[in-house]
Regions:
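Walker A (P-loop) ATP-phosphate-binding motif of ABC ATPase nucleotide-binding domains
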Residues: 2
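Hydrophobic anchor at the beta1->P-loop junction of P-loop NTPases
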Residues: 5, 33
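Conserved helicase motor core of SF1/SF2 NTP-dependent helicases
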Residues: 11, 15, 23-29, 35-43, ...
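Short gly/ser/thr-rich secondary-structure transition/capping motifs
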Residues: 64-73, 95, 241-243, 348
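Short beta-strands and strand-coil junctions in structured, solvent-facing domains, enriched
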Residues: 93, 120, 268, 344-346
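Residue-level recognition of short, solvent-exposed, well-ordered loop/turn junctions
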Residues: 106, 252-257, 281, 329
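Conserved helicase motor core of P-loop NTPases
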Residues: 117-270, 274-278
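C-terminal accessory regions
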Residues: 284-370
Length: 370
């Protein structure tokens, strides 16, 4: 039995998951929470207080190339014994992973798929959630009511406006959504720099390094992640005699840099309070804790104080993450978000891309551009 719950931000998807958990526990039914990525699984763990697994971990899919379609279809996944499987952030699931999930559950399993159908589809092939809903075969509940707390948020209300094809409405005060108009890319970059350098900290008393995330549609160009990361690194973590650094493939990794793991690594061990665990997931964000130049090792402290050791030759698994693509941000939320938008990239600026970016911000969203 498969059922779907879909809805935009503030419509109660997480609240319904919590209610489902309470009911299942009262009925003493075995259930499992899961999500497509490590960060999405972590977020549902935080919001529900219950452990959530990645789909890879649930199905014990490891040590295979996510892009090897034939191997993915032939892969013998672990059989899931739980009576109920709840999958959150389902818009990120591609055809191959859904195929493996269906293979892994029993015919009697209740599969509850939760997600926002209007977000970006999966990076891999297929728009699985959208196509299943469009089939009219699977029972689907669409949540439309925006509840009280979310209804006070201009971010949430305007994300819904964008989803409906309407232009956002910007206020000048008492708002969590701001628009800064710029005429050139250079002016846009200067606005980002001044916000990061001093304006945001004086306005909101936040830790810019940890609380702020810059999102952008692209990796290349002046407003892409590569160039923005270099500029933001110079502002937030400039070169210093007190900080060690290493150059790898034209990138400078420096102690205290904000970095992201960009592939799933099932062999990578990490420690928490002296205990060792395995697996670092694509999308995990952390900070370079220490660089051991003598032994050619670099240590990253990820969320939950996971300390991970990298040989210098493994640094292709890391990217700076002061700025990340909107696709990479899926399944995550950030307190403060800066979103540079310029009409030079208008072919990339689809409605669901903007909608996805807007719904990543929890406390403040600043859109900069023309």
């Amino acid at each position: 039995m498969i059922s779907i719950i879909t809805g935009g931000p503030g419509t109660g998807k997480t609240t319904i998951i919590k209610c489902l958990i309470d009911i299942l526990e009262e009925q003493k039914k075995n259930y499992v929470l899961c999500a497509p990525t490590g960060r999405a699984a972590k977020r549902i763990t935080q919001t529900t207080g219950k452990e959530a697994k990645t789909l890879h971990r649930l199905l014990e899919i490891s040590k295979i190339d996510d892009n090897d379609i034939d191997l993915f279809y032939e892969y013998q996944v672990k059989q899931v014994e739980d009576e109920v499987v709840i999958v959150d952030e389902a818009s990120m699931i591609d055809i191959m992973m859904m195929n493996n999930l269906v293979k892994g559950i029993k015919p009697t399993t209740q599969l509850i798929i939760v997600g926002d159908v209007n977000q970006l589809p999966s990076v891999g092939p297929g728009s699985v959630l959208k196509d299943i809903i469009a089939s009219d075969i699977v029972p689907t509940v669409e949540l439309k009511q925006i509840y009280r707390q979310s209804a006070k948020s201009d971010i949430v209300m305007n994300a819904h406006r964008v989803n409906e094809g309407l232009y956002p409405e910007f206020k000048t005060k008492d708002t969590d959504l701001f628009f800064i108009s710029t005429k050139t890319i250079e002016q846009t970059i200067n606005e980002i720099a001044s916000l990061i350098s001093y304006r945001l900290e004086s306005y909101s008393n936040l830790d810019v390094l940890k609380d702020l995330q810059v999102l952008t549609p692209v990796k290349k160009t002046e407003l892409g992640t590569i160039e923005l990361n270099e500029k933001i690194q110079d502002i937030l973590n400039p070169k210093s005699e007190s900080k060690k650094q290493i150059e790898f493939q034209s990138k400078i990794f420096r102690e205290n840099d904000k970095v992201m793991q960009i592939i799933n690594n099932y062999d990578k061990k990490y420690s928490i309070d002296g205990k060792f665990f395995e697996v670092i997931y694509n999308g995990d964000i952390g900070y370079i804790d220490f660089i051991d130049t003598e032994n050619e090792r670099l240590y990253v402290k990820f969320d939950d104080d996971r300390l991970v050791e990298y040989d210098f030759e493994e640094l292709d698994q890391l990217e700076h993450s002061y700025a990340i693509t909107i696709h990479k941000s899926q399944g995550s939320e950030f307190d403060y978000v800066i979103l540079p938008i310029f009409t030079g990239y208008k072919k990339l600026l689809t409605r669901n891309l903007l909608y996805t970016a807007m719904t990543r911000a929890k406390k403040m969203l600043i859109i900069i551009g023309n």
